Amino acid sequence: MAHVAAPAKINLGLNVLNRRKDGFHEVRTIMQSIELHDVVSVTLRRGPCTVRSPSVGDMPQDRGNLVWMVVEHLWRSIGRSGVPHGVAVTITKRIPTEAGLGGASSDAAAVLRALVRLWCPSLQRGLVRDVAESVGSDVPFFLNGGTAVATGRGECVRRLPSLHRFWLVVAVPSFGVSTKAAYDWWDRACSPELSRCELPAGWRRRLDRLTNDLEYVVAEHYPEIGEMVSRLRIAGASFASMTGSGSAVYGAFQSHAAAMRARRRVRQNGWRTLVTKTLSLTEFRNLARLALIE
């Protein structure tokens, strides 16, 4: 059996550059690991492959489930035939879904790391990355975490030096936002010329120079998202934004105490709020390290 943490992420800015011929969008974003995480348990056993979560029960074994896709793609990559079997995956969910925090992608990457260790520890890193890319745009980032710039449809990841740690108030509304819907709204409302072609100078010292192109179109349909971003700024956040395609928003603070004070100020009905912090590459590796139990 293997236990592994699956940390969430936030997007520090997200620029949509254009819509590609394959239907995906060309993007550029800074992805940052945070301490909030799910816990994934992988057990080798006889019988069919199962994927379940105590909070939702059995999960679908199809392309709507990134964890199942990881199991299936890795199974094929190591030369096995037929339907995957002999493994049970249990996911203890803490990361809100449809929130732009990358929970499903991080779970998939955690299962991939665990299964490589259990099934094929000598598998080449390039093949592991190929499996990650084939499953989802964000999955490659979660193989290593930390701070990185992601381009292409999000799968081209280049590691960056870790940012100075900051604390976050993450606010999650009672509704989720579909990634497909968010990009469809952008297609109808925006022009690629409106997006930045390069990261703004000095962004590491001034995160408020970064923008999320999707925030504005999503807030058109859900005004409360923009209102919560404003509340976080008023509460003292040095930078506040929606993450990914939403629906979660966050504010950055220099200390845990400041984040806790802000959390009390921005609480309101219909929103879940929590305090967490960013993770350096080393902290991500320590948190996401496999615990193997025979």
Where are these regions (language model features)?
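ATP-binding N-lobe of GHMP and related small-molecule kinases
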Residues: 1-99, 117-126, 163, 172-175
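Short beta-strand scaffold segments in enzyme catalytic cores
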Residues: 14, 38-42, 138-142, 148-149, ...
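A generic local secondary-structure boundary/capping motif
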Residues: 29-31, 129, 139, 155-161
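Glycine/serine-rich anion-binding loops at beta->alpha junctions
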Residues: 90-119, 137, 238-253
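Contiguous, small/hydrophobic- and glycine-enriched helical/loop subdomains that border
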Residues: 108, 112-149
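Conserved, helical-rich catalytic subdomain that frames metal- and/or nucleotide-binding sites
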Residues: 142-239, 254-294
